[in-house]
Amino acid sequence: MKYCFLFFYILYALHGHSQAISLKQYIDSAKLRSPLLRGYESQILQLQIDSAIFQATLRPQMAFISNDFYAPVIKGYGYDEVITNKAQLSGLLQVSRNFLHSGAIAAQYRNLALQSQALRDTIQLSVRDLAKTITDQYISAYGDLLSVNYTKDLYELLKNEEIALKKLAQSNVIKQTEYLAFMVTLQQQELNYLQAQIQYNSNYLALNYMAGISDTSITSIAEPLLDGSQPPVLINSVFSRQYITDSLRIQNERRLIDYSYKPQIGAYADGGINSSLQYLPYKNLGFSVGFSLRIPIYDGGQKKLRYQRLDIEEQNRIYNRTYLLTKYQQQITALTRQLQSTESLFQKIKTQVDYTRTLIEAYGKLLQTGDVKITDVITAITNFLNAENTFRLNTVSRLRIQSELNYFNQ
């Protein structure tokens, strides 16, 4: 039969590995290989370096400063010596330091810490999004695997009866047309099995691709273990915490604005040579000390505008948080009701699958003696396939609802 080779090839490929891969393994692999998460983690490391750089700017800064020139006057032509002193030789070692208000220093460190926290919140949200994407694909593949297992069991069950029916047809115990009807059903079930295998292989390889796994061999996956029984709690979750971080950041930016308008003091000391080379330049060795003072007086209204900008940002933050809370409650309520409805049907559908399977097995025994009509067997097979498909769809639906609930409750 032209499908036999493909059938046994897919069967071998599917069971090429004995150990099923779990959902957690796929999620861990995706997190490990995600360039997006790696980029966020690199930004956190960069912020740590920025904090060290800021700390270094608070220490005394040392520099060597040299300004040297010579302005000759040739036949009365040249720069005015009163202005230029004709020449200058300057070589100074300068030490300077800016003295910031302790509150300004703390606010700057706080700003870097809040940026780091915002990145951590983003990482957690990205991890949830990534885990949900992998979970959704895993559930799709698992639903296909259920179809593979059901169609495989039914195919093997019918295949075992083929020889007995053939003998009954040759002995005229059953009609040749009934035997042909059975063979058509058997071949159709074989096609269903092969189609289920192909669909599973496609979703399985897509799952590997999304998780960053380069292995193209096909193996089974384990049943996803999801628990959507506990209602998610939004308080203290990353969805709520990101708005808390934004609020703290806005408050801290107000402090930074305030401190930027406070007086700023700097001090310096230098020593070296600073000479016009006009008279005893070796005596021009010396040192100096000084300080600088900056007091903002008027900035054209920039401070007020910067406050207004932060006010708009805070209003938008409050609106987004309120919107999230409202949508969250609506979504959780809807998902909880869907899960309850799905659970109530689950056991009934499972019982129907078991009944139809038992009926087919009973018909299989009767087929060996020709005591059952082939049409009844075909009807039972059709009922089994319908029940199995309903069970698979209900299983996938339940897993997807649990995945949605887990997304908010991790």
Q: What function would you assign to each model-found segment?
A:
Residues 18-61, 173-175, 208-253, 336, ...:
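Bacterial Sec-pathway N-terminal export signals of envelope proteins
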Residues 28-38, 48-60, 92-110, 121-128, ...:
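A glycine-/polar-enriched beta->alpha junction
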Residues 61-86, 96-125, 260-287, 294-308, ...:
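Small/polar (Gly/Ser/Thr/Ala-rich) solvent-exposed segments
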Residues 49, 121, 127-241, 335-338, ...:
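Periplasmic alpha-helical coiled-coil/stalk elements that build and connect Gram-negative outer-membrane
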Residues 1-34, 405-410:
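Bacterial Sec-dependent N-terminal signal peptides
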Residues 22, 29, 36, 87, ...:
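Surface positions of alpha-helical coiled-coils, especially the charged/polar e/g heptad sites
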Residues 88-90, 136, 181, 264, ...:
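Transmembrane beta-barrel architecture of outer-membrane proteins
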Residues 39-54, 126, 130-151, 167, ...:
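Amphipathic alpha-helical coiled-coil segments
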